[in-house]
């Protein structure tokens, strides 16, 4: 297929048009008084959302070059969401502002490479100031505040997340599910999560979230590598008779065995999923034993004189629900005896007390948290399916952002933290590096301005007022007042601000240093010629068909 090439300003201007359109759709969701975006779906009812990344993911433009620009910024929004759980709209607004300012200067003759260097130095300096200004998340109240803001100012969600963290600990596992009714609920169930995802995406049962869920499932645990189907065929036949799903946790599953499992899963013959065993070496054996105790199963190991070919259904663990994504497996409601679990916890605590290695101690504490902490399940209620999906997305975002806050600390929210950090940065740069530095200094005002605009205020006036002051002074867009942001509980996770700025600068630098674009030319399909009508004269005789 023929390709078209566009160069320099022509290419960058089209890329900018794509970024602008994406930005204009996403920016309206920003802040406590951000607006909703209605998205048409290929089937079913349209979805309504105030989540920036959900809007960005839906955008595809007809112009191929503009679409490339939009897709690059869309990727930034997604990466920010994956890493920090929030800040997608901030990253998009920053990327657009940096690209817009940079494009103006490069069109006027600035050197893109020097500009990029100045931008990188400015961003690094601002991030260092953000780190200095951050403070650790203290008690439950601050966790509630962070979660509330990330859930678009929904205090009930904020409280649920804080309660969940209080019950399972800051490092505990928290999952989000749909409730049966319209009320939100919090359940804490015994469970465990480990960092191994499904071995094949064909095991997925929920294509939208790319997760596999098995309810009331058996669990096969082995420290052996499974490469031949005959190793597990007898056991598969026995579990099929029971009519229950099966999760296989093994050192590895490969070749014929994995292919056969996938094919039978796709055909609907087996309800099955497979993951690699967590950990390595001796630690893997211990973690498999932890899972066995939690689920009431037995690790099938040749060291214990057990083989897969002769394994019985009684050796399998059982769990009420198992959820697997590409990175993690969560086992909820394991059917092991509580006394066995308690004994195992005591055993691990004894090992922690006796070990001298910091690394071993850390790994033992991780195992202890997995065994004793359980899993908190937040059940989200709503009156309709559309509302349920929107609310569930908000809870997921709030949960990720809260974990980010616990991890790296918090800064003042409402877009003020970037401005305060920038006020303390004074770099002595020259020529086009200075241009890059000034681009960042102007662009970091954009998030606060957009929050104010969405709330019905003049963005420029609000930014000027905030810049006149120092410390925790900022703008509360919910009521239009200037307040002490920490006292009002208007806070953001440092990780969210940091990653949003880093990603925005990264993609803007790529776009500004782009000198050519290559895309396929859409070929217009020729309209087919009309068929020859010459033989239709005989149709006069059709009168007899009456």
Curated annotation (Swiss-Prot):
Pfam families hit by this protein? Cpn60_TCP1
Name the residues that bind ATP. 29-32, 50, 86-90, 414, 492
Compartments it resides in = Cytoplasm
> Which reactions appear under catalytic activity for this entry?
ATP + H2O + a folded polypeptide = ADP + phosphate + an unfolded polypeptide
The alphabetical list of record keywords is: ATP-binding, Chaperone, Cytoplasm, Isomerase, Nucleotide-binding, Stress response
SUPFAM superfamilies this protein is in?
A: GroEL apical domain-like, GroEL equatorial domain-like, GroEL-intermediate domain like
Record's GO cellular component, any one?
A: cytoplasm
Domain of life (superkingdom): Bacteria
Report the EC code(s) recorded for this entry. Answer: 5.6.1.7
**Which GO molecular-function terms appear in the entry?**
ATP binding; ATP-dependent protein folding chaperone; isomerase activity; unfolded protein binding
A GO BP entry is: protein refolding
**Function per UniProt:** Together with its co-chaperonin GroES, plays an essential role in assisting protein folding. The GroEL-GroES system forms a nano-cage that allows encapsulation of the non-native substrate proteins and provides a physical environment optimized to promote and accelerate protein folding.
What family does the entry list? Answer: Belongs to the chaperonin (HSP60) family.
Q: How does it assemble?
A: Forms a cylinder of 14 subunits composed of two heptameric rings stacked back-to-back. Interacts with the co-chaperonin GroES.
Listed NCBIfam families = GroEL, PRK00013.1, PRK12849.1, PRK12850.1, PRK12851.1
Q: What is this protein called?
A: Chaperonin GroEL
Q: Which organism is it from?
A: Helicobacter pylori (strain P12)
């Amino acid at each position: 297929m023929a390709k078209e090439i566009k160069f320099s300003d022509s290419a960058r201007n089209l890329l900018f048009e794509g970024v602008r359109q994406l930005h204009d759709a996403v920016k309206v969701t920003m802040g406590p008084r951000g607006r909703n975006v209605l998205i048409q779906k290929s089937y079913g009812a349209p979805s309504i959302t105030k989540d920036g990344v959900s809007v960005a993911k839906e955008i595809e433009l007809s112009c191929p070059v503009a679409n490339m620009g939009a897709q690059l910024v869309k990727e930034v929004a997604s990466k920010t969401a994956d890493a920090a759980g929030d800040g997608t709209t901030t990253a998009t607004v920053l990327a657009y502002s940096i690209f817009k300012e940079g494009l103006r200067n490069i069109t006027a003759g600035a050197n893109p490479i020097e500009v990029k260097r100045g931008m990188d130095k400015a961003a690094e300096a601002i991030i260092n100031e953000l780190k200095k200004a951050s403070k650790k998340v203290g008690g439950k109240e601050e966790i509630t505040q962070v979660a509330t803001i990330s859930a678009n100012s929904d205090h009930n969600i904020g409280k649920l997340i804080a309660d969940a963290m209080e019950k399972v600990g800051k490092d505990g596992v928290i999952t989000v599910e749909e409730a049966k009714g319209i009320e939100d609920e919090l359940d804490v169930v015994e469970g465990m999560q480990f960092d191994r995802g499904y071995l094949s995406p064909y095991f997925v049962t929920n294509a939208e979230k790319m997760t596999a869920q098995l309810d009331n499932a058996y669990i096969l645990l082995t420290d052996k590598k499974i490469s031949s189907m005959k190793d597990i065929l007898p056991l598969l036949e026995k579990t099929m008779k029971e009519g229950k799903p099966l999760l296989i946790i093994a050192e590895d599953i490969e070749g014929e065995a994995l292919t056969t499992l996938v094919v039978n899963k796709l055909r609907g013959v087996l309800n099955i999923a497979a993951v690699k065993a967590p950990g390595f070496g001796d630690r893997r054996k211990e973690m498999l034993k932890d899972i066995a105790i939690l689920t009431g199963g037995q690790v099938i190991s040749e060291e214990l004189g057990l083989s897969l070919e002769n394994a019985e259904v009684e050796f399998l663990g059982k769990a009420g629900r198992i959820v697997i994504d590409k990175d993690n497996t969560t086992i909820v409601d394991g059917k092991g005896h509580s006394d066995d679990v308690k004994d195992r916890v005591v055993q691990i605590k004894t090992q922690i007390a006796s070990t001298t290695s910091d690394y071993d101690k850390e790994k033992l504490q991780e195992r202890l948290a997995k065994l004793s902490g359980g899993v908190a399940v937040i059940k989200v209620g709503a009156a309709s399916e559309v509302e349920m999906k929107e609310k569930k997305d908000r809870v997921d975002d709030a949960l990720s952002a809260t974990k980010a806050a616990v991890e790296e600390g918090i800064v003042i929210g409402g877009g003020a933290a970037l401005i305060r950090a920038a006020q303390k940065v004074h770099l002595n740069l020259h020529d086009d590096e200075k241009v890059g530095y000034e681009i960042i200094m102007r662009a970091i005002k954009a998030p606060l301005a957009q929050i104010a605009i969405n709330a019905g205020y003049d963005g420029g006036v609000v930014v000027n007022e905030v810049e006149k002051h120092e410390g925790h002074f900022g703008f509360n867009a919910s009521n239009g007042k200037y307040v002490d942001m920490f006292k009002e509980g208007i806070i953001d996770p440092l990780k969210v601000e940091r990653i949003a700025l880093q990603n925005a600068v990264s993609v803007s630098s790529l776009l500004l240093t782009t000198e050519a674009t290559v895309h396929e030319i859409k070929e217009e399909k020729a309209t087919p010629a009309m068929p020859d009508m010459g033989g239709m004269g005989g149709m006069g005789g059709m009168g007899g068909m009456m």
